[in-house]
Curated annotation (Swiss-Prot):
Pfam families: EF-G_D2, EFG_C, EFG_III, EFG_IV, GTP_EFTU. HAMAP family: EF_G_EF_2_B (MF_00054_B). Residues 8-283 form the tr-type G domain. GO terms for molecular function: GTP binding; GTPase activity; translation elongation factor activity. The lineage of its organism: Bacteria, Pseudomonadati, Pseudomonadota, Alphaproteobacteria, Rickettsiales. Gene3D superfamilies: 3.30.230.10, 3.30.70.240, Elongation Factor G (Translational Gtpase), domain 3 (3.30.70.870), P-loop containing nucleotide triphosphate hydrolases (3.40.50.300), Translation factors (2.40.30.10). This is Elongation factor G. InterPro entries: EF-G-like_DII, EFG_II, EFG_III, EFG_III/V, EFG_IV, EFG_V, EFG_V-like, G_TR_CS. Catalyzes the GTP-dependent ribosomal translocation step during translation elongation. During this step, the ribosome changes from the pre-translocational (PRE) to the post-translocational (POST) state as the newly formed A-site-bound peptidyl-tRNA and P-site-bound deacylated tRNA move to the P and E sites, respectively. Catalyzes the coordinated movement of the two tRNA molecules, the mRNA and conformational changes in the ribosome. It is found in: Cytoplasm.
Amino acid sequence: MSSKGDLSRCRNIGIMAHIDAGKTTTTERILFYTGKQNRIGEVHEGAASMDWMEQERERGITITSAATTCFWNDCRINIIDTPGHVDFTIEVERSLRVLDGAVAVFDGVAGVEPQSETVWRQADKYDVPRICFVNKMDRIGADFYACVDMIKDRLGAVPLVLQLPIGVDKSFVGVVDLVEMRSITWEEDSLGAKFNYGEIPSDLMEKAQDYRARLIESAVEMNDEAMNLYLDGGEISVPLLKSCIRSGVIGAKFVPVLCGSAFKNKGVQPLLDAVVDFLPSPSDVPTIEGASASDPQKAVTIKSSVDDKFVALAFKVMVDRFVGSLTFIRVYSGKLTGKSVVLNSAKGATESVGRILRMHANNREDISEIQAGDIAALAGLKKTTTGDTLCDQNFPVVLEKMDFPESVMEIAVEPVSTADQEKMGTALSRLVAEDPSLKVCVNSESGQTILKGMGELHLEIIVDRMKREFGVEASVGAPQVAYRETITKSAEIEYVHKKQTGGAGQFAKVNILFEPLPPGSGFEFENKITCGAIPKEYIPGVQSGLELVKETGMIAGFPVIDFKATLFDGAFHEVDSSPLAFELAAKGAFREMANKAGPVLLEPIMRVEIITPDEYMGDVIGDVNSRRGRVAEMQDRHNAKLITAFIPLGKMFGYVKDLRSMSQGRAQYSMYFARYERVPENAVDNVMKK
């Protein structure tokens, strides 16, 4: 931090948005204007420093979240640049989990787009205060005021306008600063490094006065002193106004909205000022709640203090070809020095910290110490995975784990040779450690290795990384939909596993109540055994059996989700019972339940947003209906129609080609996972045949 231990001069922020809204371009300008780098890296040239992977530079998109640190106005800003493509939403999720604030970037032409809504909801989930930056104001069709309306209508947010654009499209030259009531214009020959303050253009003065009055009216509600002064007709000073805005942002009462054009080098410095002035420091964030490692029911409060015991959360693991495994952590309290030993409370094991590294994308800087509020990477950890808590050995605490989305697509991969088989095992173990949304399993019938991920692009990148980084040559099957199964009725099952073949036998009796749960609940296991009907050392065998057997399905071999299993009674034999016997009994109970609990097949439903010229709307809607889709909403959008529909993922293969064909290449779409729904009876047979 700028002054050691001063948490108030630190900001941990993320840059988030829909793909192509300009997140990485904005981040590159931030790094240039703060002096972190002496040149501007352009995404379209494959030269953005934050997009360091080969695949990112080739495709011009961000795939993995990248961290860096810069300074502005004597404040340390730790920045995480996140992906905008829906297939890499896990990178946004785990970044927001450890950030104190965020900058949401919007395309000034497109406004609020599908992934904008997704990342906004993710930020809501973790109560992350944010400010908005309406980018690309130099583009033809950019509409700042329409974008503000969309932030209100589509995101349910309360926008607080702090700037107005000066000029439209190519004539965009700067902004009106409503807090200071002045204009800011940029000098193009300095790449935007130089800017000038001036008078507000006369044609914007009336609008500026109107918006400033609205700004003050909303802001003073955050401070009694300011409210009384306002009601008495007094002048609200700039420092008092900024203090009110800051309180409202931290309290999630509203979101400040600024504008500019990162690519044209306009608007970035005031955005940095807003980050420092309005987003919270680690000391502004409420205390973190954890649980005792020895007693999960006992709550533990962690304060953002350098002087308290060390507590941190591991939010990302990556493999560096030079230093091996790197574990990214956010420190919530205390300090950590190199060569320390810490407790991984999630694993119940100690870890030796080798080096502490400050990261700039994939570049590393050794540092001797980190403390509360810092984000850094640790080298040398062996057992830590994403979501684990690291803490002082004398303060065993567990922070809340992260939730990761269900995979919706899968592919089969087969190594070309025996040598590739060995390399593939190593590659996949490392990639799974890095990416919690990637799942790997082996098909019990075909013996094929199955990769499960968030979409076609996600899996395509994984296969490409196996080849480039690990030298694995593999044949890849066509993408398949990741169907699921669930139950619709409760069923109470009594099952006895008994086997006697001479010598030691096997005996286990279980009574399990199976119940359906709401969508998205996953699997829950509850032990209600009383009076020692089943010894406690056998209970894990029951849970393990259910965890294993639910992956084999009931109808078509797909994993079973959204149900609860309650073990409420049973029996054991002093000699013949064992954990294995109870595991087998649980599996038998599950298979018997499948015939009584109304099993059904589930399919992933995608939210699809299509922008099409009016003349093709009829064809597009007809095509949506033919794919078993449901049109949920239609809106006017810049001489076109925005159609929101929900369509089964299994019906979306090849859609990009079909949409281009029916619209002569003028329509476009984006989609992301919405939920799992029951497959209609008339479509079940088709799924079973696949």
